[in-house]
């Protein structure tokens, strides 16, 4: 998910007015509405990142994980993104790398920065004030509040990208079967 504005609706899905109408109708029908919040990252088109990437000394300069290159110009660690490739992307304006656990278009927020935490709490309050009943928190396992120096992951010559490990398959089968039990049309 690429979040460009944490307090707006993706225009593909309508407007805030449309959302308010949906929310009111759902509540009139006795339904509760939950929305996704992605606290770990945002879009590289979000105003927070657009400002942060401009320089090392603006008000949001440390809202993301920015790290100088190694002496040879390479990425600061050997970390890989979940979607393949390096977890670091070079930003020529800052002459630094930024961390992204997923896509380069999804830079990780820096939870070591209290202003980031406050901004995310403000986002939650914004949606609660609109009447949202709850949230599904996405990608929380990738929240990173550590600070440099970052360390390389140890080499793992046996690592293979592939299907779900055998020992995890029974649990996910059980999860799938439970969902089908309650919703047989799935």
Regions found by a protein language model. Give the residues of each.
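Acidic/aromatic-lined carbohydrate-recognition and catalytic surfaces
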Residues: 4-125, 129, 141-186
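Hydrophobic residues within beta-strands of alpha/beta enzymes
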Residues: 135-137
